[in-house]
Amino acid sequence: MTRQYWLRWFSLHGVPRVVLRVQSRKGDTFARMMGPEGIADPHPYIETIRSQGRLVKTPLPWVTCDHALVRSVLRDDRFGVRSSARIQIPKVLQRFANRVPPPANPADPPAMLRMNPPDHTAMRKPVVSAFTPRAVKKLRDTVETVTEELLDAMPSGGSIELVESFASRVPIAIIFDILGMPREDQEKFLAWGKDMTPMLDVGISRRTYGRAMQAAQSLNDYLDRHIEKLRREPGDDILSNLVQSGDLDHYALKANASIIIGAGFETTANLIGHCVSLLLRLPEQLDRLRAEPQLWPNAVEEALRYEPPVFITARQALTDLELEGVQLPQGSMVMLSLAGANRDPAVFTDPQRFDVARPNANEHLSFSYGVHACFGASLARMEATHAVRSLFERFPDMRAAAPPRLRQQLTFRGYAQVPVHLGRKVQVTPSTVA
């Protein structure tokens, strides 16, 4: 990592990392939730924060786990996402970090995750066209084909690790089709994505940040070549359309392509992993799905509620404002626990229970809300529903081979490994699992 990037890491992650450790030792609940204990099981910390009020002050940001308040902040145009920092840091460090531009990546401007209207609106509009319900419906055949190919390759009676061999493979194949990229390059992108997603966490290590920067640079180099190719030979895909439209400059094209790639497969892979792990752990819920297969879409909504692929997000006050009777000066950061909102007892009965028939499971906030709501939500739902149902119908005796292992990340919360014994393979026609 170059000296410039080391200083950027120090500004955005090094200082918060030290502060979080110090506050964790002092027993601060938020700091402990953001550390190794919280990654392993964040919910005791969430409930402690919830018991302290709807909006809770910590030594770093404000925090809320309240469903109504999280939803309100997400749609409030007095809040935005302009800061590159994930928690509040001194202005001098923020200014310095902004003077050291990183390779285009999903975590920094001009990526849509870090833009506000009207710039965000202008960048989002041409991308959303690839993810409308009508466009997603057209992708269903591709999702079914990719899923069946992966399941066909799995050995009857064998043991595999599902994240690497299945959960990540379905969404990356679909994203590659959307972006007009050759499938033989998927392995590179899976590796780059694995290294880059920690950039969205708080206080990552210097080594982790260095790997992320290397992956971001490799992705940039690839996208430079791919975008130039699309200028000469455009295809029938969203990235070709963006290149040919001229609406985005070259750097913005790369930043937003990296979002489509990263968010497009990382969140869906996490969702598939959570669905499989939950159903293996709770066989009575799987039995109900077998008896009532019409519940499969709702089961995916409940998995989104119970284990959201994105655990927490943040918003920054764009002006002096009042929230819950508290005066927040401009620049104040509010951490929004999507996982906490999704288990708010004011909204969900018996919220700590996973129930595939929960009548209001779809009231979760796992895909965010407001102007930054996930534009790929319909696609993620469709992919996960088909992939998970097909997996369990092809391998009805599948069971866990070992406890699943979580990634050491909190923002994008998912499994690094889900080892399973597949058991016998059953041949199922695509129409049966449609």
Language model features: what each stretch is:
Residues 1-434:
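Cytochrome P450
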